[in-house]
Structure formats: C-alpha cells, structure tokens
C-alpha cells in the first residue's frame, strides 16, 4: 500500500536518530487537522523541545492515540552528526522504497538539505521516477505532520517515561550501531 512519510531528527550525543511518521494517504487530511488542533493560540508549529514538561506529556499522549505508525533509525555519533544522519536516512529510504512509498517529506535544515539530496540520488539511481517516490524538504511551520516525527524523535531519545508514552505508535526501531 502506498504511504507517505514525514521525517525529523533528534541528536542526543552519543546518539543520533531519525523518526519517520508513516501515514496512509487517506488519513493525511484528518491527521493534519488533529495536529493543528494541538497548537496553542498564536503558536505556528509544535517544536517539542520548546514545550514545558506538562504540555509535553499531553502532546505525547495525544500523538500516541493517532492512527499513525512511527519508525525510528538510530546510530551512535561522537562529534559530527552528518555521517550518522545519512546512515539513518539511507536505511529509512531503503525501507520506504521496499514499501513502495509515494511521498517523503523531510524537515528542512536549509543548506544541509544537500546531503539528504545526495543520499536520495544515490539510492534512487539513474531512474528516480521508477520508484514513484517524490521527496521534498519543507519548513515544519508549513507541514504539521512533521510535528509527529519531532515529538516521536524527542520522546524516543529521552527514553524511559517518554518512550513509553509514544509506544502505541512505534512500529520499528532500527539501531545501526
């Protein structure tokens, strides 16, 4: 079944991780509405690390009830996170291609987006249209489904209580060492 993936990252040295919120196309509209309903008055986006602990709990619990699947890819990193990110990203893209995903939306890191694009070109080969995977980098203020990945990445990286809160939506954890 074709799916869409919405991807964000979290770095908690010595661990780097990428979370992908996997969404069925028929649920995109409903999930966007659900995510926007979580905004506070005047808020343009959810950025989990900026939220207060009580609100974090409420947000994590709300996301755990959504009809979404989250996949997490982790790798240890000592200093530079980019090699770890690209290893996680490549594994994610490979899994998305195997699932015949149609859309990949990545939280933009502006100038650093070029590294993701290189990895995508390498994996998609000389005929990217054969995969039917369309990808784009967007700012998280313009795509509310990226917030699911942001919350999941933060909670997974924080461990213990936080990881338990999002466990209902967690489907896959790939540790790349």
Task: Label each residue range with its predicted role.
Residues 1-177:
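Phosphate-ester processing/binding pockets and catalytic centers
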């Amino acid at each position: 079944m074709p799916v869409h993936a919405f991807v964000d990252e979290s770095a908690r040295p010595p661990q780097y991780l990428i979370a992908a919120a996997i969404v069925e196309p028929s649920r995109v509209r409903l999930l966007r509405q659900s995510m926007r309903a979580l905004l506070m008055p005047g808020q343009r986006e959810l950025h989990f690390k900026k939220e207060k602990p009580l609100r974090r709990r409420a947000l994590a619990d709300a996301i755990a009830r959504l009809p979404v699947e989250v996949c997490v890819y982790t790798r240890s990193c000592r200093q530079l996170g980019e090699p770890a990110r690209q290893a996680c990203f490549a594994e994610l893209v490979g899994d998305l291609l195997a699932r015949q995903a149609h859309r990949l939306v990545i939280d933009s890191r502006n100038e650093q987006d070029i590294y993701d694009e290189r990895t995508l070109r390498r994996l998609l080969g000389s005929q990217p249209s054969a995969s039917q995977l369309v990808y784009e980098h967007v700012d998280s203020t313009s795509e509310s489904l990226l917030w699911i990945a942001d919350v999941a990445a933060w909670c997974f990286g924080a461990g213990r209580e936080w990881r338990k809160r999002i466990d209902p939506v967690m489907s896959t954890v790939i540790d790349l060492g």
